[in-house]
Amino acid sequence: MKILIDENMPYAEALFSQLGEVTMKSGRTLTADDLVDVDALMIRSVTKVNESLISKANKLKFVGTATAGMDHVDQELMKERGIFFTAAPGCNKVGVAEYAFSAMMVLAQQQGFSVFEKTVGIIGCGQVGSYLAKCLEGIGIKVLLNDPLKQQEGDTREFTELDTLLEQSDVITLHTPITKTGEFPTHHLINEQVLNNLRADQILINAARGPVVDNQALKARLQKADGFTAVLDVFEFEPEVDFELLPLLAFTTPHVAGYGLEGKARGTTMIFNSYCEFLGTEQRAYASDLLPTAPVPKMKLDRAWDEATLHNLTQLIYDVRKDDALFRRNISTPGSFDKMRKEYWDRREYSAVELTGDESCNLTPLSKLGFMVKPTL
């Protein structure tokens, strides 16, 4: 049995080699010839699975993407060809949410505002958007939600019309898939008209899909230099980036918002377990068994936490400025976008750290943000 796997999928080689002959390759450069005689394909979002890619896939029966998003796979084609397809919904929701929160916290320091006095508008309320909303509300930050598809499906949460959310939010963070058809397409959802209507004191964060934001229109909006702030983890034509846009962004990174070690381990184990089920084997893998101990596994609070404490705690675990600096320093080198993704550091989630403290420390909200908490007597 031959299994072809994206080389940027941690733990995959060791796990899948238990099931067959494994080949690791760059997911972005896969060709039809690579899939000849391949039984199973394990990918991430950079691989577009379409008619061209699988035109020579004479034995392909299983495709798994170790990502929550599925818009890079032609699912109708999978059905037509009798190829079983699976994804890893929610695997990276924590990492993406913590990326967005890190950007908010650092900007709060730089621009001199309190995150607790801001309203955060979340566009797209699937796994990531819903998790981010839960975290923010858990620590007392006001949230507005927009997701017309969820609303149509009967989701009982309180949703806000898009125009109202754009007007009333101080921070706008995007967590939609990319769609070009249907009643609510997201391609260029944030277009020239939307951008020109945003206030100078608003912040836009895109850690979803690059084409959700019209990058040329965003560049023009930022060139007004009126204080409007944007953070991009994704680009419209990645891995190509607009070098005129980069210096205008507060923070920018090469599509790594969801690249936390826990998220990648979850994605790998989820599709490994799906493949085991597909094969009818009883083997299973668990992300928690694969993860190393965090560099700072425990911290003790000696008083009630405040916003300064929150800044320190979250930045100790993940500070978006680290990835921003690495990206800006290396992006001019050809191939650096994918190289940084491939060599990404072992970033951890808040849950890797156990916080202890007595009742006066008020640890419960921090648990809602994702930290492991252990009250002491």
UniProtKB/Swiss-Prot annotation:
The active site is at residues 209, 238, 255. NAD(+) binds at residues 127-128, 147, 176, 233, 258. SUPFAM superfamilies: Formate/glycerate dehydrogenase catalytic domain-like (SSF52283), NAD(P)-binding Rossmann-fold domains (SSF51735). Pathway: Cofactor biosynthesis; pyridoxine 5'-phosphate biosynthesis; pyridoxine 5'-phosphate from D-erythrose 4-phosphate: step 2/5. Substrate binds at residues 45, 67, 259. Keywords: Cytoplasm, NAD, Oxidoreductase, Pyridoxine biosynthesis. Its EC number is 1.1.1.290. It catalyses: 4-phospho-D-erythronate + NAD(+) = (R)-3-hydroxy-2-oxo-4-phosphooxybutanoate + NADH + H(+). Signal peptide: none annotated. It is found in: Cytoplasm. GO terms for molecular function: 4-phosphoerythronate dehydrogenase activity; glyoxylate reductase (NADPH) activity; hydroxypyruvate reductase [NAD(P)H] activity; NAD binding; protein dimerization activity. InterPro entries: D-isomer_2-hydroxyacid_DH (IPR050223), D-isomer_2_OHA_DH_cat_dom (IPR006139), D-isomer_DH_CS (IPR029753), D-isomer_DH_NAD-bd (IPR006140), Erythronate-4-P_DHase (IPR020921), Erythronate-4-P_DHase_dimer (IPR024531), NAD(P)-bd_dom_sf (IPR036291), PdxB_dimer_sf (IPR038251). GO terms for cellular component: cytosol. One of its GO terms (biological process) is pyridoxine biosynthetic process. PROSITE patterns: D_2_HYDROXYACID_DH_3. It is an enzyme of class 1 (oxidoreductase). Homodimer. Belongs to the D-isomer specific 2-hydroxyacid dehydrogenase family. PdxB subfamily. Catalyzes the oxidation of erythronate-4-phosphate to 3-hydroxy-2-oxo-4-phosphonooxybutanoate. This is Erythronate-4-phosphate dehydrogenase. It comes from Vibrio atlanticus (strain LGP32) (Vibrio splendidus (strain Mel32)). The lineage of its organism: Bacteria, Pseudomonadati, Pseudomonadota, Gammaproteobacteria, Vibrionales.
